[in-house]
């Protein structure tokens, strides 16, 4: 059996929330989280494959620091995303662990395994062409793995968010 390529260090933890602003306030007040940076009022993901079918969806997204870890808050703005599915089925909570990977295709194949685990999302970010995917391996782990392609574009895009943890 060939060992899968080792994932790099954790990039962020993603939480699905009902209200991005309220979640930021609560995390700041209860846990000293922050500062937070918003990705805007609406991030619209176009031409994304969700469960293998083309769709689009919108989210409100904010990044912040919590105990030295970068966190992502995701508020679904419609019912077409895996985030909305998660919220309806499980309520607010930890949705995914994310990794920036230089060898996207190789890592995606390794994380999916054999037989391949469900590919919840396969797409690119809004207006930036950074490849990303959600893999749901199921089983006892119960948390989705997000892979984001490490590239000069993703480094420039995610740099300000990564700096939140260094403050």
Please name every model-derived segment.
Residues 47, 56, 93, 155, ...:
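Solvent-exposed, non-transmembrane amphipathic alpha-helical segments
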Residues 1-6, 84-90:
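Short, flexible, solvent-exposed loop/turn segments with mixed acidic/basic and small polar residues
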Residues 11, 62, 95:
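Residue-level detector of short, conserved catalytic/binding motifs and their immediate flanks
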Residues 1-6, 15, 17-25, 29-35, 66-69, 72, 77-82, 109-167, ...:
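Vicinal oxygen chelate
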Residues 6-9, 56, 90-93:
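Short glycine-enriched loop/turn motifs at secondary-structure junctions
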């Amino acid at each position: 059996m060939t060992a899968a390529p080792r994932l790099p260090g954790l990039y962020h933890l993603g939480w699905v929330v009902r209200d991005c602003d309220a979640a930021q306030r609560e995390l700041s007040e209860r846990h000293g989280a922050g500062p937070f940076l918003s990705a805007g009022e609406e991030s619209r993901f176009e031409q994304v494959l969700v469960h293998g079918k083309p769709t689009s969806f919108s989210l409100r997204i904010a990044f912040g620091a919590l105990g030295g870890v970068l966190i992502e808050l995701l508020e679904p703005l419609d019912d077409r995303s895996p985030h909305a599915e998660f919220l309806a089925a499980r309520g607010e909570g930890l949705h995914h662990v994310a990794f920036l990977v230089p060898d996207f295709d190789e890592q995606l194949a390794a994380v999916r395994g054999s037989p391949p685990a469900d590919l919840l999302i396969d797409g690119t970010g809004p207006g930036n062409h950074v490849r990303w995917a959600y893999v749901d391996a199921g089983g006892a782990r119960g948390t989705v793995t997000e892979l984001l392609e490490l590239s000069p574009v993703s480094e420039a895009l995610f740099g300000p968010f990564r700096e939140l943890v260094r403050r």
